[in-house]
Design a protein with these regions (language model features):
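Class I S-adenosyl-L-methionine-dependent methyltransferase catalytic core
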Residues: 1-216
Length: 216
């Protein structure tokens, strides 16, 4: 008997395999619009997609493309992986030390509005290129920026629903360790996040009603 699929894991490869098992009939990712160096696939047993894109290609076979304007026809793929940047700052925290390491690894946007607009536009583009019932796998992370709490996974879900997706599933990737700067300990006002999310969105007209809006 197959092992029960859980919603949490310390291993993102396990999460991706679980998503493919539950939600992608052929078990394959067709397109990765933010491929980077292929960390989801290298040595994991997960088959790399045929279509690999990145704004700044770093690996062989990756084409230069913006996730908001992909060189794909409408309704041409069945499953897309999207792992966008999650940082946005102009502050001193990313100019040296741990902050600079994070910047080099993950990329950074100038402000939260630009970052989240990128998310929304990329979601719309994913909806354009996915076939009916196609799957968008969206990795995202909440964070604190300039003392404010940004629940990005909530924003992502809301934008996906507006674009025409159904939130079919969500997985939580747990971390045992995080890069932490001294100033983050000295000035801590919020819990340090040791998790991120893998949303599973299906291109579908299915809608969920959580409450009756009519007055009674």
């Amino acid at each position: 008997m197959s092992e029960l699929v859980k919603s949490i894991s310390y291993d993102q490869s396990e999460i991706i395999r679980s998503i493919l098992r539950l939600h992608v009939p052929n078990g394959r990712i067709d397109c990765d619009s933010t491929y980077s160096t292929g960390g989801f696939y290298n040595g994991t047993g997960i088959e790399p997609p045929e279509l690999k894109y990145d704004l700044y290609p770093q690996a062989e076979g990756v084409q230069k493309a913006d996730a908001r304007t992909l060189p794909l026809a409408d309704e041409s793929i069945s499953c897309m992986m999207f792992d966008p940047p999650f940082l946005a700052t102009k502050g001193e925290s990313l100019k040296a030390g741990v902050g600079n390491i994070i910047n080099r690894r993950f990329g950074v946007y100038p402000d939260e509005q630009s970052l989240h607009r990128f998310y929304a536009d990329a979601i719309k583009e994913a909806h354009r290129v996915l076939k009916a019932e196609g799957i968008l796998i969206f990795k995202c992370q909440d964070k604190v920026s300039s003392g404010k709490q940004y629940m990005s996974h909530v924003f992502v879900m809301n934008e996906a629903v507006k674009a025409g997706f159904y939130p079919a599933d969500i997985f939580i990737l747990l971390a045992k360790n995080r890069l932490i700067a001294d100033w983050q300990i000295r000035n801590q006002k919020h819990a340090r996040k040791y998790h991120c999310y893998f949303w599973v969105f299906r291109k579908s007209d299915l809608q969920i009603t959580y409450a009756d809006d009519q007055e009674k």
